[in-house]
């Protein structure tokens, strides 16, 4: 990874006055935004939206996001929806606070390729609603096969990319947006009992990411709306 992405928090850009993240502890998309806010050192208020109880369908929440999904981020007097749009806003608004994209255009494109592979292929095909429909129509066994197939195709492609680009993390030894989207997907793979043996690079990078303090504090179990054990 080029040095330009390895900067520290040297920015003089003032922090926004109030930042509110609408999140659900188990949402992988909201987890991406929690991570970016933590890496960039932007304090935020956590507003829980209980997806299991259907709070995303209330009139109040639909006004914030007509697609009725988390995450939503209120920042700088605007309301932003969609995790990738939010990540790009944070990166462009606070480019010097722990940069998550390098300046090199080819590397940026490769990082966007990984972000897209995970956020536009792997994650949408295993959303809770889709898995519930498959289970209801075809049963638990077919649902598991569906999950395994998505991961097999998605992670095989990702492994081939990361073999060439990874250092300690997805692109060299610097955290980028690719790592931000990988963290929740890696956790989902483990939760859904995906065999990671065919993907040694993903496994190594995922485990290295899990050691970071920002990752530890952003995990679902550490969110205010996680069930108390
Ligand atoms: N492309 C959107 C997808 C957001 C998304 O899929 N959110 C899920 C949780 S990870 C959700 O809110 N689902 C609510 C539902 O399925 O009713 C993003 O990246 O933010």
Residues covered by each model-derived region:
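Generic structural signal for helix capping and beta-alpha/helix-loop junctions
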Residues: 31, 54, 206, 226-227
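GST-like fold's C-terminal all-alpha helical module
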Residues: 106, 114, 118-211, 217
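C-terminal helix/juxtamembrane-tail motif
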Residues: 215-229
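A generic structural-conservation signal
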Residues: 46, 70, 198, 218-219
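Short, solvent-exposed turn/loop segments enriched in Gly/Ser/Thr/Pro and often Arg
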Residues: 24, 50, 177, 222-223
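GST-like domain detector, emphasizing the conserved glutathione-binding G-site
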Residues: 2-145, 149
